[in-house]
Amino acid sequence: MKGGKRVQLTRPNRINSEIRAIKVRLTGVEGDQIGIVNLREALKKSEELGLDLVEISPNAEPPVCRIMDYGKFLYEKSKSSKEQKKKQKVIHIKEIKFRPGTDEGDYQVKLRNLIRFLEDGDKAKITLRFRGREMAHQKIGVDVLNRVKNDLIELATVEYFPSKIEGRQMIMILAPKKK
């Protein structure tokens, strides 16, 4: 390909002939300290063992290098990072919308959904929207939010409870209780 840019592979660690130091602090396969040796000598030792010389800490004086199987090292590193990602729980905020005049049947359905969200470990955002003349009856809206809060007292803790109306809505945020 004419005039194309070459893609250069960059490794997180320099290995074997990529190491630029004259002397290195060498550690063995099991992590035992060998000492400060000449780079050629360190490369020779790693070749004898059939392993790679990997620069672990390039900013140290002299740089710290370790004799190891670099492919295996990268595999173990990626495996451990995948394990850490698996253990992380992503918390989503699920939203349920109420109105001041939400009827009993609808209220129960929405409450059931809130319970499901909280049991799954997600946060819940309860939005209470006012329309038209409902703005004059904000107390009814606060009563609805208090009812939701009291119905979910065993499952959730209130992270945010509105002190006043924001625009045409009130928002309450619930977080699941720690088990």
UniProtKB/Swiss-Prot annotation:
GO MF annotation list: ribosome binding; translation initiation factor activity
Keyword Chaperone: no
Entries under PROSITE patterns matching the protein: IF3 (PS00938)
Superkingdom: Bacteria
PANTHER family in the cross-refs: TRANSLATION INITIATION FACTOR IF-3, TRANSLATION INITIATION FACTOR IF-3, MITOCHONDRIAL
Assembly: Monomer.
Name under which the protein is recorded: Translation initiation factor IF-3
Name of the gene this protein is made from: infC
